[in-house]
Amino acid sequence: MTAKFLFSLFFILCCSVVYAQETSLFNGKDLTGWHIDVPALDKDTNLRNPFIIRNGMLVSLGEPQGHLITDKIYQNYRVEVQYRFAGAPGNCGLLLHASTPRSLYGMFPKSIESQMMHQNAGDFWCIVENIEVPEMEKRRGPKENWGITEGKERRVRNLTDNSEKPLGEWNTMIVECLNDQIKVWVNGDMVNHGFNCTAQKGQIALQAEGAEVEFRKVALTPITKISE
């Protein structure tokens, strides 16, 4: 009787606990679940798609420049991206809470960018959305220059140096978005934590911004709290 009771209790407890499941946003075969926005293709449809699949990896070729954007909108999540620069160091970014396309310089969707640029991973860039951090003037410059549109100071510097792996090695960027907060880790180092974000949901996007970047993991997990 006792064993039966304990088994029943165990079963009930197991059924009552819901574990957040990690979901891969990239199936390793094609770009299902994503769409591209590459302004140059409007004028010349013969240009190559800068986002391809190669050896089971998602690859941003860098040119022509543009974005690979999820079809779905996400809110309150952790996204893990494993990436490396395949050749020369360069620029790329992970865009969070993306919405209106081509809102900045006729290229960038309205969003908050978690920078992947070599030696600057984890900077925030405000793209017609805003976010705050402690010591704003130290990390963003004089307040009178702040802004979220062309010509304004949109960069919010990260908190660390040397968090990235040597060129050619794989980096892991983890970003947690919960309500108005965004927190970023690079290879286990907490590199940025913003609050009062003006957007709390949206699409996720990867950039083609001049350099070839390989991605072997892009995965999302729903969250209800920010990690310490």
Can you annotate each of these PLM segments?
Residues Q21-E228:
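Carbohydrate-interacting regions of secretory-pathway proteins
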